[in-house]
Amino acid sequence: MITVSNTVENLERLSDEGVSIWLDDLSRKRITSGNLAELIAHKHVVGVTTNPSIFQAAIGSGEGYEEQLADLAVRGVTVDEAVRMMTTADVRAAADILRPVYDATGGRDGRVSIEVDPRLAHDTEATIAEAKQLAWLVDRPNVMIKIPATKAGLPAITEVIGLGISVNVTLIFSLERYREVMDAYLAGLERAQAAGIDLAGIHSVASFFVSRVDSEIDKRLAKAGTDDAQALKGKAALANARLAYEAYEEVFAGERWTALAPAGAHKQRPLWASTGVKDPAYKDTLYVDELVAPGTVNTMPEGTLNATADHGDIHGDTVTGGYAQARADLAAVERLGISYDEVVKQLEDEAVAKFEVAWGDLLEAVATSLRGKGADGE
């Protein structure tokens, strides 16, 4: 059941600390029931993120999509076309609901993100083409196109930003890759500036994934079985994210940035993603309470949003004072024989594969629905 709690003091405090609250979920029901509008009005939600898994769950349920599916079946569209028409319709509707936020914040918030086809994660040119098509299909100024931070995704980010399209860079797990993402963004801004595009119209976030880092490293710490290993559980993800913020501060105080800022460029904000706690031993608001820093975004599932409203512990900046401890924690993990580079590479590969599976499941579900309504579903 979709509900809106009246406990919002913690969410107001989080917003006041400079953290933009985005909802990591979207469905036709959430739009048509008025729930999304309620969350914006009463729970400080100022943006929405989607991904293939979210759309697979929403459209796979069928709820709210029957009429559009019937229309698409009559028109004889392909499965891929049907999926894109349904997902972009949801994103367009959400963008319209969030448009007042977009206008009030000068484009900083009020954003809705939609991801390129995950099957293209290792194809630069196809990703660029898909990003341009999605921006055209949604046709709203407050859409952000999600491009994965794979090696092939990096030049696509530069190209798409260079065209003046706002981008949410997703699936970032490592500090090295995050620096490459920021470099790709700055290169895109430089390209846009050279082409005479107004930099003030370009916004970007870099989605740094959090809880999955703990899930994998904690599993390896448990295998180590020592007291030292046990003491490090639940620390790696926060350490990783805090050091990412340190890198953000460094890059956006550097010469490349200071050359772009006078032209109206916006910093690429860090976005904390995968902030739902997966280990029941941890407080369910851990990745919200402990990642409060100015100029960030935290996109959270509704359960985490409600938990933060109810019993979150928002008490100022919990990031910038922790860089030395963060480095110490990651170094301690390495000393136990757990390779940081190996973990983050595995997480990236698994995340891309997971979204490919979800997209395949979505295509299959839509094909079945189209066939059931008289289309061939090819």
UniProtKB/Swiss-Prot annotation:
Catalytic EC class: transferase
Catalysed reactions, semicolon-separated: D-sedoheptulose 7-phosphate + D-glyceraldehyde 3-phosphate = D-erythrose 4-phosphate + beta-D-fructose 6-phosphate
A cellular component term, taken from the record's GO annotations: cytoplasm
Pfam family for this entry, one: TAL_FSA
GO terms assigned for molecular function: transaldolase activity
Span of the signal peptide: none
UniProt keyword list: Cytoplasm, Pentose shunt, Schiff base, Transferase
GO BP, one annotated term: carbohydrate metabolic process
Record's keyword annotation contains Repressor: no
Record-listed E.C. numbers: 2.2.1.2
Superkingdom to which the source organism belongs: Bacteria
Transmembrane segments: none
Biological or metabolic pathway of the protein: Carbohydrate degradation; pentose phosphate pathway; D-glyceraldehyde 3-phosphate and beta-D-fructose 6-phosphate from D-ribose 5-phosphate and D-xylulose 5-phosphate (non-oxidative stage): step 2/3
InterPro entries reported for this sequence: Aldolase_TIM, TAL/FSA, Transaldolase_2, Transaldolase_AS
Subcellular locations according to the entry: Cytoplasm
Record's function text: Transaldolase is important for the balance of metabolites in the pentose-phosphate pathway.
Family to which this protein belongs: Belongs to the transaldolase family. Type 2 subfamily.
Name of the featured protein: Transaldolase 1
Source organism per UniProt: Streptomyces avermitilis (strain ATCC 31267 / DSM 46492 / JCM 5070 / NBRC 14893 / NCIMB 12804 / NRRL 8165 / MA-4680)
